[in-house]
A protein has these predicted regions:
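Active-site beta->alpha N-cap acidic-glycine motif
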Residues: 212-302, 306, 350
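C-terminal domain-boundary segment and adjacent tail
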Residues: 383-400, 447-493
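Active-site-adjacent pocket scaffolds in enzyme catalytic domains
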Residues: 285-292, 358-451, 455
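Primary recognition of N-terminal secretory signal peptides and signal-anchoring hydrophobic helices
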Residues: 25-230
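Bacterial signal peptide processing site
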Residues: 21-23
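Metal-dependent polysaccharide deacetylase catalytic core of the NodB/CE4 family, i.e.
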Residues: 265-369, 439-442, 446, 455
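C-terminal motif of bacterial Sec signal peptides marking the signal peptidase cleavage site
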Residues: 16-19
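Sec-dependent signal peptide recognition
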Residues: 2-10
Length: 493
């Protein structure tokens, strides 16, 4: 009898266990919702801010087990929200990109950092971020993006490229090269939207704006009929090491953020290697790995993330003892096809080494021979300058011009030319009255905005700025819109 009851109990236990397995199996067969957000994932796995610390907390790791990554180290101070971050682990600088210990950053920000299978979860200021280690996707509270550079990992200590950290936390950054300090403010988009205050500038009074407003009604009928494209290119972007360019890249990032907020695409004509032989300056990113060039690379990453299109503007944009951006590089000043090919390949090599995506080529000062053009076409689909091989007056101003050589590459003119320093009002008036049957294609030197951008620091040590509404660029954008140009990207032509 006892044996019988024992048998019954064993049978019931087996049925019970089988039932649990069937339930678990049935759950595993339920298809996952591929549209789940990070918030859904957090709720599904109970990864709320209260429970994150119960998982594998990577902020409490023993750093003594850290194995050096074998990358060039650098001493730099990182400030976030007014506080210097304290690092026990090295800061790395690889190919002019900084890498910081993500574990220590989260610890410094009083956050939590946990790992669950193939995902990292970060809780910063009660905001949850996740990094999928399988596909390098970062999920933020308000966006999702792919890592620019892979995380570096040693014994569950993760290093993140500063460009990716900035993109994730939406940082506004100020780079102090004299003291090697990067001063940051989290959630910059919430902070820098208040950019409407005027910067006093005696050279540009409101009468210029008033004149433009008076002409607005006159341009309305013309703009409604205009179907032409508009193109904006920021010219001669490079790292000069000159004192007058101290705030150059910060101002450029402010400009890029403004353009992105206005949903206006723009182009960056980048000079990869700046040379100034008279001052013995040669900023070659292939041979130099430093704070100054790192800010340039960071800025190019930032602009790419903010609706910018990057292209090569020659290699050094100079020859002989001339300074980059001022000197010529090709054409009648250097007609050699061998030199041209060598420099083009060096420019491409530099961009590839720095992992900067390139979408067009612009020859310096539009000076190039027909034979050099034929070589350029082998490397680039978009040649962002007029096709003058049959004469300057033969360049197509109304549309991109298909190459007669390879029937593939496109040459793009700039009929609106550029805005000359000291003649800003005259140039803007010329553009306002331009022939709208031509492309609204113009190039612009970012330094013209310096007088309209004021950089500040508040009482808590947060970097801030004001960007005047009556700036040259903002007036240019207004004119292009009022003339009806549809501002686009060369990659969409």
């Amino acid at each position: 009898m006892n044996k019988f009851f024992t048998y019954i109990l064993l049978s019931l236990s087996l049925i019970s266990l089988t039932g649990c397995n069937d339930i678990n199996n049935s759950k595993s067969q339920i298809p996952e919702n591929t549209n789940n957000t990070i918030e859904d994932k957090i709720m599904d796995e109970d990864l709320t801010s209260d429970n994150l610390s119960k998982n594998n907390n990577l902020t409490l790791i023993d750093y003594s087990n850290f194995k050096d990554l074998g990358i060039n180290k650098d001493n730099v101070t990182l400030k976030i929200n007014g506080h210097d971050l304290d690092f026990n682990l090295p800061i790395y600088l690889d190919k002019n990109r900084y890498y910081f210990s993500l574990n220590e950053i989260i610890h410094n920000l009083n956050g939590t950092f946990t790992k669950d299978e193939d995902c990292l979860y970060l809780n910063i200021h009660d905001e949850i971020y996740s990094i999928n280690l399988l596909d390098n996707t970062i999920h933020c509270p308000n966006k999702e993006f792919k890592l620019k550079k892979d995380l570096l990992n040693s014994e569950n200590i993760y290093y993140i490229c500063f460009s990716d950290l900035s993109n994730m936390l939406d940082l506004y950054t100020r780079w102090d090269k004299d003291n090697k300090i990067i001063n940051c403010k989290i959630n910059s988009s919430q902070y820098i939207n208040d950019t409407s205050s005027k910067v006093n500038n005696d050279n540009y009074k409101n009468n210029s704006l008033n004149n433009e407003l008076e002409d607005k009604n006159n341009s309305t009928s013309a703009s409604s009929k205009n179907t032409q494209i508009g193109l904006i290119r920021f010219e001669d972007v490079c790292v000069t090491s000159q004192g007058y360019d101290k705030n150059y890249f910060e101002n450029l990032r402010i400009i890029g953020e403004y353009m992105n907020e206005q949903n206006i695409p723009y182009h960056i004509a980048w000079i990869p290697r700046y040379k100034n032989p008279n001052f013995k300056i040669d900023n070659d990113p292939l041979t130099k790995n430093n704070f100054e060039i790192a800010e340039m690379v960071y800025t190019l990453d930032y602009l790419k993330n903010n609706n910018g299109i990057i292209g090569l503007h020659g290699y050094t944009h100079q020859f002989g003892n001339y300074e980059s951006a001022a000197g010529f590089e090709f054409g009648k000043f250097e007609p050699s096809t061998d030199v041209f090919k060598e420099k083009i390949e060096k420019a491409i090599e530099t961009a590839s080494y720095l992992d900067i995506p390139i979408d067009f080529f612009e020859v310096p000062h539009y000076e190039i021979t027909p034979e050099q053009n034929k070589i350029a076409e082998k490397y680039f689909k978009i040649l962002y300058y007029p096709f003058n091989d049959y004469g300057v007056d033969k360049a197509d101003l109304k549309k991109p011009q298909l190459s007669p050589y390879n029937n593939s590459s496109l040459y793009i003119s700039t009929p609106l030319d550029y805005i000359a320093e000291g003649k800003e009002d005259i140039c803007l008036d010329r553009i306002k009255k331009s022939d709208i049957s031509n492309m609204g294609s113009v190039f612009f030197h970012p330094s013209l905005e310096n007088a309209f951008i004021s950089l500040n620091e508040d009482s808590d040590g947060y970097p801030s700025f004001n960007y005047a509404d009556n700036s040259i660029l903002k007036r240019l954008v207004t004119i292009l819109k009022e003339n009806g140009f549809k501002i686009t990207k060369v990659t969409e032509l």
